[in-house]
Every structure is written in C-alpha cells, then in structure tokens.
C-alpha cells in the first residue's frame, strides 16, 4: 500500500503532564473528535480508551504509554499518552526520545506541578519542541494567568499566549483566538462538537489587544522582513503569524499557550489545529545521528523513504493475544512485513512478523510502514528497549537511550513450586518490557530480588504478577547488601588431622592473608617451592578458601577484597587428599578472618537531589541526618542541585520523605558508588540484627 500522507504531514507528538492534570481525558477527546472513538471514555469510571491495563483503570492513572494514530485537517497524528507519576518517569523518557513534539497539559488550578517540572526537564534534554494547554479552566480556582507565570518561574520556559479564556470556573464559555482575533464559543448540548465564532466581548477587548501585541512582537523577532514591516506599522497577516509561531516552536524560541476544558469538551479542536499548525514534522526535526555498524564512525539518517531503513525500538509489551509487541519509530526507509532486519545493538538477525497500527489496545494489520511512522511489531525474538533495527546491508546504531538505575529493592518468595515456575516466566517478561525494573538472585539467601524506581513502581509490578500471571508470593522488606573484609595482614599455620582406622585425613597449610585493593575482590596465589604441597592438592586449597567467601565471621555477609598467599604446608603419602587440604584451608581461613580484624562494609550511594531553592536547606539537613556527606551544590536552570554520598541503609523511604517536605517538587536520582567501612556503633546494630 503506497504512502497515504507525505512525511511533512506527520505529527508525532506526546501528551505530557503531572498526574491528574487531565492528560488522558485530553487524549480521549482528541480521539473522539478525530473520529477514532465512538464514545467518550472517562477516567473517573475507568473506561478511558488509552488506559487499558486493569491496574490503570482502577487507579485512574496511566502507566504504559499507549500509541495511537488519528487524522486531523489532512494530517496524520501519531499520539503517545505518557504517565505523569514520578515512579513511571522511564515511560516518559522513552516516549520523548521518539517524539517530534509535545503538548504539555497543565491543571488550570494547580499550574506547573512537580512532575511537570521533571517531564519538562526531560523534554529539554531531548530538545523536544512543545506547546502548552492549560486544562480544567472550568474548575474552581482555575487561573490561566497564574499558570502562565508559573511556566516562567518553575521551569524557566518562555510562554506566549495564543489564546485567552472567556470566563473561568462555572462561567468558562470559550476562548479568544489571538491569531484570528475572534472569540470561539462552544454550545453545551452538542458534546463540544459544535462551536462558533463571535466578536471578542467588549470587557475583554483591551486584554485581548495587549496579549495580541505580545504575541506579534515575540513572533516578528524571528524574521527580519516581518520585523521591518511591523515597525512600519504593518501587522502580519494570519498566514504569516502562523508561519512565525511555527518557526518559534520548532526552534524552541517560545512556548505557545492554549486553554480549555477537555472534560467539558471545550478547546480541544483549536488545540488539534495548533498541533497541526505549530508542532514539527519529522522533516523539521531533521536527520538522526548514529554510528556506522562497520566503520564505527558517526553517520546520519535523513527522514526519507529513500534512505536505508533505520528503526528504534522504544517500548516492549506483552500482549495477551499477540504475544510480545515491540513499539518502533521508523526514522528512515520503508519496512515491509516479512522482511529481514539486523538488530545492530546486539548483532542479531530478526524477521518482521506482523506489523500493527495500534489504537490504545485495538490493532490493525498493515503490510508496509514508512519513515515517520510509529508501529508495533509482533514476533521479534531478542529485541530490548532502546535497540536499533536496520537494513543489514547498510547497518547503523542509533543513539542509545539512557535509563536510570533502580533505587529500591524488595525480596519475593513464591509460595509453591508451581508459583516458582510461573514467577520465572513472568519476571523475564516484565524485565524485558521495562528497563527500569531489574530482577536478580541473591546468592547468599537464594531469594529473588526485584528492583525498581519507587514504591508505587514495585507495587504495580507485584500486582501484575499476582493478577495477570496468577503468581502467589510473599513480599519481603527492603534489604541492604553488606560485605565483610580484613583490616590487617595475618599469618595462619593450620593442620587438619583425622584418624578413624584405615585411611585417615592429613593436611597442613600455611598462608598469609592480607587486605586487597578496594574492588579487586578475592585473589589466591601459591608460593610453594619444592613440593611441600603437591600440585594436585592446590586446587583443593583454593576451593576451601573460596567456600568461606560466601559468609564472613562478623554477621555472615560475603567477604571481599582479600588476598591469600599459600607459603608452606605438609602432606602424608597415604592420608592426604584434595578433600583434606580443602578442609584445612577452610578452617585456617576462618581463623585468619577472626585474627585479621574483620570489619563490615556498606554500600554508599551517589545521590543527586534537584530541588527548588526554597527547599535546599531542608534537603541538606535531611541528608546530613542520614549520615550523608554533601559533596557540593550548583544551579540547573532555576533549580538547585545537591550532590551527596549517603549510605544505602539510610535511604529507605527517602522518596516519600523528599516528596512530602518539598510538596513533591524535588526529585532525586541515586546510584551505587562504592563500599565503605561501617562506623562501629552502626556495625554493632547490624551484627545484633543478622549474626
């Protein structure tokens, strides 16, 4: 099937916002007015089209960004709905990576909220052009002008109004279009489908003229001819003004602001017009950078069907009907069902099975997809989020996505053997779908450890395990991975002798045990000369030493960074064996750990807190109370960044503490940095708990 829309007519955009700002409702209205939904789904009653997982419909929040295709004014819209909760930031990050533009939805009452700040910063990171929609103008306390001020104060944005509201709260009737200088009023009884132009109300004429001037002045600055004409007293016409606003959005010079009430069906059609008029097409965003698979030199792929195929996999989902679905953005070339691809990130071959166009959780099979398309592929074997798929003959690796390290972990134990099998399958699927969710096995306890971005993140994973995969399991409290090591060099001479009639056991070992460099782990070497311990018994010595590493003498934690040198020993022609030397070295090593001043080590995390300036003092005070060491602070935009080293043991519950004292406006990232000796008073508490 040939291309239905030129690539210039594509708008790949996301809808981003804080939780509860009305993002999903806005998307629902867009789908309704573009003819994709026959009935309007409401978040309140759990019927929203885009929120299709049970967990989303119950909690009224969007967890997975569903992709959908719609059409408006002859343009093709690929819309990605993103979650607004801080624990699902990863979903937002990967959506922004593949979008060309975004609509930032604000709650007319709350304005720029904490997650709006986080998402805005992420959009800055990926240079995503955006327009702003001030939603919920019908809500008590809605204040359009305060929201505009907050865009400047909180996210250092550059808002320019393209619309003003007519009335607010219960009296919100419509908008003033500052480009056309007309009032647009909606008729209540027609579900927002009917609206008409009127003259601007007399009481708003002055305000409209003032904001129209601000808009025109901001726009003409981008074009010398328009500026010259304006200075000569000539206002730009509607087409010129729209062209200049588009230039401003694509070049990220300013953020046009629109308003309405998605719930009351007002303002959605002009917002769709703004998406079409102002947000960039793939052509506006230009070529994407990558690395040539063979030469490893930088290369680019232009947004064109004529270029070699390059595709980025940005989301993987397990679909109950189709199996594994991989959401992809095609940056260049044409993809056909059945064609062979190279996963250049992993150097693995793949074949395109079914190609699907997604509408929330409905799907339509297609045979071909083109540059600019966002499609879902079924049946790919080894693709992970962030992988590049491409033409094997002209292979390229596109820029990789970056994923934050998980900051919280819990242990999970299946209740039965059947649950154990189901758990293994379920966890491998969940980990493939979500790169910020990690699964590992604790070798000391044998427990399965789940790691995620926050408590809600892990709650929802556990909920999916129980409901979708029917796994019955016990969930443990979060734990810290302590370690043990030596502080001084010591020497041990140990003899193992056992006589029980017949062949006995005999082995003597003499070794030095000393601290190794941090991070070097365990090292063993033999300095035996002259056969005091025969060669065939030395592996037995090493095996005995290694068997002690799993559990130290303080509280049974793994032993790290120790060097053992075998210096001497003795054997018996008949009674010695590899097993006897293994037993001797095991007992001797434990003795050395007792004598060598064993200490506890704890993981130290590198913590970065991004906070509005008002809360900096509270952040620093709180980190100090957690045995943290402040490394420094600097400014980022209009936010303060505090860097610190803090023991992991003191970081549990931090996400909730930080959220509460900063009203959720501060965010933090945390990653492992190094192990450090535990202070003696804390070591005694740990010993009492675990020994």
From Swiss-Prot:
Subcellular location: Cytoplasm
Family annotation (InterPro entries): EFG_II, EFG_III, EFG_III/V, EFG_IV, EFG_V, EFG_V-like, EFTu-like_2, G_TR_CS
GO CC terms, sorted: cytoplasm
Domain tr-type G positions: 8-283
One Gene Ontology molecular-function label: guanosine tetraphosphate binding
Name this polypeptide is given: Elongation factor G
Positions contributing to GTP binding: 17-24, 81-85, 135-138
Record-linked Gene3D superfamilies: 3.30.230.10, 3.30.70.240, Elongation Factor G (Translational Gtpase), domain 3 (3.30.70.870), P-loop containing nucleotide triphosphate hydrolases (3.40.50.300), Translation factors (2.40.30.10)
PROSITE patterns per the UniProt record, alphabetical: G_TR_1, G_TR_2
Keyword tags: Cytoplasm, Elongation factor, GTP-binding, Nucleotide-binding, Protein biosynthesis
RNA-binding in keyword set: no
Family under the similarity heading: Belongs to the TRAFAC class translation factor GTPase superfamily. Classic translation factor GTPase family. EF-G/EF-2 subfamily.
Organism: Azorhizobium caulinodans (strain ATCC 43989 / DSM 5975 / JCM 20966 / LMG 6465 / NBRC 14845 / NCIMB 13405 / ORS 571)
Function noted in UniProt: Catalyzes the GTP-dependent ribosomal translocation step during translation elongation. During this step, the ribosome changes from the pre-translocational (PRE) to the post-translocational (POST) state as the newly formed A-site-bound peptidyl-tRNA and P-site-bound deacylated tRNA move to the P and E sites, respectively. Catalyzes the coordinated movement of the two tRNA molecules, the mRNA and conformational changes in the ribosome.
A single GO BP: ribosome disassembly
């Amino acid at each position: 099937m040939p291309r239905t829309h030129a690539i210039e007519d594509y708008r790949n955009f996301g809808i981003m916002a804080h939780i509860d700002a009305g993002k999903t409702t806005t998307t629902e209205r867009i789908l309704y007015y573009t003819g994709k939904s026959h009935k309007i789904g409401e978040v309140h009653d759990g019927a929203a089209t885009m929120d299709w997982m049970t967990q989303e419909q119950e909690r009224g929040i969007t967890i997975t960004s569903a992709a959908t295709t719609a059409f408006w004014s002859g343009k093709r819209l690929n819309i990605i709905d993103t979650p607004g909760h801080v624990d699902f930031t990863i979903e937002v990050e990967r959506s922004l990576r593949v979008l060309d533009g975004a609509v930032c939805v604000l709650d007319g009452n709350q304005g720029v909220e904490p997650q709006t700040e986080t998402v805005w910063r992420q959009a800055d990171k990926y240079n995503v052009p955006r327009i702003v929609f001030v939603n919920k103008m019908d809500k008590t306390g809605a204040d359009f002008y305060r929201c505009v001020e907050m865009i400047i104060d909180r996210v250092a944005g550059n808002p320019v109004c393209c619309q003003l509201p007519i009335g607010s709260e219960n009296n919100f009737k419509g908008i003033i279009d500052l480009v056309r200088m007309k009032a647009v009023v909606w008729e209540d009884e027609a579900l927002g489908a009917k609206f008409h132009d009127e003259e601007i109300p007399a009481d708003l004429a002055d305000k409209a003229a003032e904001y129209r001037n601000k808009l025109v002045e901001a726009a003409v600055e981008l074009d010398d001819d328009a500026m010259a004409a304006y200075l000569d007293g000539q206002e730009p016409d509607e087409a010129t003004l729209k062209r200049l606003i588009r230039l401003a959005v694509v070049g990220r010079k300013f953020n046009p602001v629109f308003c309405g009430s998605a719930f009351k069906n007002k303002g959605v059609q002009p917002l769709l017009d703004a998406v079409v008029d102002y947000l960039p097409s793939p052509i506006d965003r230009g070529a994407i950078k990558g690395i040539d698979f063979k030469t490893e030199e930088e290369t680019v792929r232009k947004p064109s069907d004529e270029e070699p195929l390059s595709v980025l996999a940005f989301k993987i989902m397990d679909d109950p009907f189709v199996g594994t679905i991989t959401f992809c953005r095609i940056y260049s070339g044409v993809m056909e069902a059945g064609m062979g691809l190279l996963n250049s990130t992993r150097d693995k071959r793949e074949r395109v099975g079914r190609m699907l166009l997604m509408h929330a959780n409905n799907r339509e099979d297609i045979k071909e997809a083109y540059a600019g398309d966002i499609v879902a592929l079924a049946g790919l074997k080894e693709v992970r989020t962030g992988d590049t798929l491409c033409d094997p003959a002209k292979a390229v690796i596109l820029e990789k996505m970056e994923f934050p390290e998980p900051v919280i972990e819990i242990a999970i134990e299946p209740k039965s053997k059947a649950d154990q099998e189901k758990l293994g399958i379920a966890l491998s699927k969940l980990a493939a779908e979500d790169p910020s969710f990690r699964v590992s096995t604790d070798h000391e306890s044998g427990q399965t450890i789940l790691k995620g971005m926050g408590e809600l993140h892990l709650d929802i994973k556990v909920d999916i395990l129980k409901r979708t995969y029917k796994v019955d399991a016990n969930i443990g409290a979060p734990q810290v991975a302590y370690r043990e090591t030596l502080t001084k060099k010591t020497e041990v001479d140990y003899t193992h002798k056992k006589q029980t009639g017949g062949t006995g056991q005999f082995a003597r070992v003499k070794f030095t045990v000393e601290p190794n460099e941090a991070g070097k782990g365990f090292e063993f070497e033999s300095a035996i000369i002259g056969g005091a311990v025969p060669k065939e018994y030395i592996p037995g010595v090493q095996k005995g030493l290694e068997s002690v590493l799993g559990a130290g003498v303080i509280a049974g934690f793994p032993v790290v960074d120790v060097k053992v040198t075998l210096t001497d020993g003795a054997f018996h022609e008949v009674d010695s064996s590899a097993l006897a030397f293994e037993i001797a070295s095991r007992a001797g090593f434990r003795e050395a750990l007792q004598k060598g001043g064993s200490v506890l080590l704890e993981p130290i995390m590198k913590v970065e807190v991004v906070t509005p300036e008002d809360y900096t003092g509270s952040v620093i005070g709180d980190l100090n109370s957690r045995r943290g060491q402040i490394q420094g602070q600097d400014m980022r935009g209009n936010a303060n960044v505090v860097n610190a080293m803090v023991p992991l043991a003191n970081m549990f519950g931090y996400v909730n503490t930080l959220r509460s004292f900063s009203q959720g406006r501060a965010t933090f990232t945390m990653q492992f940095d190094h192990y450090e000796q535990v202070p003696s008073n804390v070591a005694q508490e740990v010993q009492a708990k675990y020994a």
